[in-house]
Amino acid sequence: MITIHRVKDLRAAIRQQRTQGKRIGLVPTMGNLHAGHVSLVKQAKELCDYVVTSIFVNPLQFGANEDLDKYPRTLDADKEKLVAAGNHLLFTPEVSQLYPEGLERHTKVITPGLSELHCGASRPSHFTGVTTVVSMLFNMVQPDVAIFGEKDFQQLAVIRKMTRDLYLPIVIESGPTLRETDGLAMSSRNGYLSAEQRQTAPLLYKLLQESAEQIENGDKDFAAISAEANNRLTKAGFVPDYFNIVNSDTLSPAVPSDSDITILAAAYLGTTRLIDNISVHLG
């Protein structure tokens, strides 16, 4: 595996692979890699000849009071995991390399509508930061395929919309959410949880499963299902952000006639924001 820090070196390395007819895959990450990230790299290897993983803690997608400064940076351990997974190129730019004029003066990529719902309502500038940096990575690497995890379901939908709207010749693939043995979705932020919070955290997925089962069994009172889940989260010590039952394609509120439904959930446990989702296919 080679490690590259500068855009011009990245482009030169990619160009060399292109001249050999290689199919390029991209896995964008913010580092602190876990088994979920590694599974995306392995998926990229199955689909492509040459895999590029980026590690960049993107300041543009963090709000003013969020965890940019304390976000875990574990580059040496990340490199070991990537080498073991068979990754070919690691791109780890400095902030000054990607945002030479600073964040305020940098051109932004905005996906109206979809990016304003759910997580976007709570974190207004978050998805603008995501789509901006991902579009930059797409332009630098020009991959044939890019792979994102399904745990960040809304992010995946936003990136698909951006790719479609801008006519980018990139196939967006997704990898399934990997979970701990007790059901908690793997996340780089799980390390923030105290031992007691870690015991409580799996309730979020348990409620998603129970709510999905209710819907599969014919319960279409989505508002009541959401209200009950939020109430149980609150009683357990969470501060719910949302527990929304949506159309899987549009992410707008689900209606009883929808056949593909996703339940999106976000809640704070202490200062840690956990997100998760589950999909329901009816008929």
UniProtKB/Swiss-Prot annotation:
Keywords: ATP-binding, Cytoplasm, Ligase, Nucleotide-binding, Pantothenate biosynthesis
Positions with a binding annotation for (R)-pantoate: Q61, Q155
Superkingdom assignment: Bacteria
Enzymatic reactions: (R)-pantoate + beta-alanine + ATP = (R)-pantothenate + AMP + diphosphate + H(+)
Binding-site residues for beta-alanine, renumbered to this chain: Q61
Pathway in which this enzyme or protein is active: Cofactor biosynthesis; (R)-pantothenate biosynthesis; (R)-pantothenate from (R)-pantoate and beta-alanine: step 1/1
Pfam families: Pantoate_ligase
Bilayer-crossing regions: none
Main subcellular location of this protein, as a coarse class: cytoplasm
CDD domains listed in its UniProt record: PanC
SUPFAM superfamilies for the chain: Nucleotidylyl transferase
Subcellular location: Cytoplasm
Active site, per annotation: H37
A biological-process GO annotation: pantothenate biosynthetic process
Enzymatic class: ligase
EC number: 6.3.2.1
Binding positions (ATP): 30-37, 149-152, 178, 186-189
Assembly and interaction partners: Homodimer.
Note: The reaction proceeds by a bi uni uni bi ping pong mechanism.
NCBIfam families per UniProt: cyt_tran_rel (TIGR00125), panC (TIGR00018)
Family: Belongs to the pantothenate synthetase family.
PANTHER family: CYTIDYLATE KINASE/PANTOATE-BETA-ALANINE LIGASE (PTHR21299), PANTOATE--BETA-ALANINE LIGASE (PTHR21299:SF1)
Protein name per UniProt: Pantothenate synthetase
Organism the protein comes from: Hahella chejuensis (strain KCTC 2396)
Record gene name: panC
